[in-house]
Amino acid sequence: MALVEAVEPIIYGNTKTGISFDSITGAIIAGVVVGLAKTAFLGKFPDYVEVLIGVGLLFMYGQYDLLRGIGFVLTADGIYGLIKNYISTSS
């Protein structure tokens, strides 16, 4: 949540710093949607594509709560996957 509060004013160019109920609900719904989508596609998308899609959603459609949630979930999950792959390949 701290990441959202830190990034939100930069992306939207305002002084709003706070997590609204809609953002939390959007993130929960987005987590379920992304989880189901990843299960259906069985991880066929590379992690960097997931990060690019997530960042694109944040920049283009960040004013909509559900799409913002999906963008954050995709970005966070993609970054986690990149870090996990880097650690497992370098060990």
From Swiss-Prot:
GO terms for cellular component: host cell membrane; membrane. Keywords: Host membrane, Membrane, Transmembrane, Transmembrane helix. The keyword Transmembrane applies. It comes from the Viruses. Signal peptide: none annotated. It is found in: Host membrane. The chain crosses the membrane at residues 17-37, 40-60, 69-89. This is Putative transmembrane protein ORF91a. It is a multi-pass membrane protein.
